[in-house]
Amino acid sequence: MAARMCCKLDPARDVLCLRPIGAESRGRPLPGPLGAVPPSSPSAVPADDGSHLSLRGLPVCSFSSAGPCALRFTSARRMETTVNAPWSLPTVLHKRTLGLSGWSMTWIEEYIKDCVFKDWEELGEEIRLKVFVLGGCRHKLVCSPAPCNFFTSA
């Protein structure tokens, strides 16, 4: 990915909140243990509008030096919490916040990349995988015609 993402689970809604982080971002870090992700190198999140980057579908504020708006990615298929899915992402993240053993942050990062972004990339704007912009953000989500590809250049 072109930018590192900070993630935190909202257990009340089973929603994973993601936002780009970097040394140049002045946005407030997300509270809690999962928000305490060390900043990446200055080149990971550029100070300009990010229009040259390959992450299609993310609003331009994702790369703003003024601090990106929070992005909420939800995937009904991947975020289900059932007895038959004890290793679902919300369960893993909740156990980590309680200090219990769980899968590593590396696994969580891979999960996000492989399950959430890959689903969006392969399936396009699917009804069960949606992206919302929070915090009164006026930036619109712009997606190329299906399949929406986060990982190839425009």
From Swiss-Prot:
GO BP: DNA-templated transcription; symbiont-mediated activation of host NF-kappaB cascade; symbiont-mediated arrest of host cell cycle during G2/M transition; viral genome replication
Keywords carried by this UniProt record: Activation of host NF-kappa-B by virus, Activator, Apoptosis, Host cytoplasm, Host G2/M cell cycle arrest by virus, Host mitochondrion, Host nucleus, Host-virus interaction, Modulation of host cell cycle by virus, Transcription, Transcription regulation
Region (Disordered): 28-50
Cellular component, GO, one term: host cell mitochondrion
Record-linked InterPro entries: Transactivation_prot_X
Span list, region Mitochondrial targeting sequence: 68-117
Assembly with partners or alone: May form homodimer. May interact with host CEBPA, CFLAR, CREB1, DDB1, E4F1, HBXIP, HSPD1/HSP60, NFKBIA, POLR2E and SMAD4. Interacts with host SMC5-SMC6 complex and induces its degradation. Interacts with host TRPC4AP; leading to prevent ubiquitination of TRPC4AP. Interacts with host PLSCR1; this interaction promotes ubiquitination and degradation of HBx and impairs HBx-mediated cell proliferation.
Full protein name: Protein X
Natural source organism: Hepatitis B virus genotype F2 (isolate Brazil/w4B) (HBV-F)
Gene encoding the protein: X
